[in-house]
Structures are given as structure tokens and as C-alpha cells.
């Protein structure tokens, strides 16, 4: 954790270290903000092919999710970048998580759009 205010002296704080879930190679970072200031920090953990949802206030791990193969779309792996939106739409009531999928059998990288409701439970 590093303060973003340049007028405050830098003081780094370890939040998570490499572990069974947090394997090396953290790649993407996004913030899901709720209207009350609460929300999640989402971290792409490329070494684990998954995504950590961390509580913004407590900095505690809320959940760790992976996106697996489904009947129509494959899962994700080797994610470099992510983004999240809390914008409500008719299809995605609480927003979306967009992840870059770095490996596919056909050789083409792509993006997956995930319903925030499905990963934030």
C-alpha cells in the first residue's frame, strides 16, 4: 500500500505476500467503488490465473475467483489487464469486470465481460 498524495512521505506497507493463492506475477489492478465509498480492489493474479477481490476499507481478501470454460466461451488465463465498472445497465445491474484473456487455443487473445453479480458474492 502506497499513499497517492505526493505531499505525504512514502511509507510502503505489505498487504499480501506470495502464497498458495497469490502466486507471483500480479498484473492488473482495478477499483470497484460503491456509492457509499465501500467496494473492492480487484487484482489479476496471473500466476494463479485468477482474480482477487480485496475489501477497500479493511484490505482483507473477500474472495478469489477464476473464470472457467463454459459451454460457449472458454475461461481465462495469463491475464495482463483488467477493468471494472459499477455502472448499472439493463443486463448488468451492478456493473461488469472486463478481463484480458492472454491465451486461447486458436491463438487469438480476447476480452471477457463478467457480470459483477456473479463474482462479488
Indicate where each model-derived feature is located.
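Sequence/structural signature of beta-propeller domains
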Residues: 1-121
